[in-house]
Regions:
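A short glycine-rich, His/Asp/Glu-containing loop-to-beta-strand
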Residues: 1-27
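Double-stranded beta-helix
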Residues: 11-13, 17, 72-96
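Short, conserved beta-strand element in jelly-roll/cupin
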Residues: 18-20, 29-46, 84
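Short beta-strand His + acidic residue motifs that chelate non-heme Fe in jelly-roll/DSBH
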Residues: 27, 46-47, 63, 69-75
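Structural motif
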Residues: 43-45, 52, 68, 78
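Short acidic-glycine-tyrosine-enriched beta hairpin
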Residues: 50-65
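Short, surface-exposed secondary-structure boundary micro-motifs
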Residues: 66-67, 86
């Protein structure tokens, strides 16, 4: 993924990301951070606490803290999205 910080503070982070086709991030969770993903372009496949959900452009999904999750781009086009983290997720990521 390529990512650009739009806002970065101790209490809130907003990052715009681009995920190439047929890529994914590692399954993980955050101890203290809740997140909202807002899809700008494409369709994201999320694995959230063992359940798969599709999220399309102009839709969002909320991930509570301590819930295992993964985002995948199973499409033929780039996936672009915003990830909003409260508080910031830096150093609060546990890979599974």
């Amino acid at each position: 993924c390529d990512g650009w910080h739009l806002l970065k503070s101790d209490t809130l982070s907003v990052i715009q990301e681009r995920m190439p086709p047929h890529t994914s991030e590692q399954l993980h969770f955050h101890q203290k951070t809740q997140q909202v993903f807002y899809i700008l372009l494409g369709t994201a496949t999320f694995l959230i606490d063992g359940e798969t959900q599709l999220v399309k452009a102009n839709e969002s999904i909320s991930i509570p803290k301590q819930v295992p999750h993964q985002i995948r781009n199973e499409q033929e086009e780039d996936l672009c999205f915003l990830v909003i983290s409260e508080p910031k997720s830096h150093s609060d990521r546990i890979n599974l």
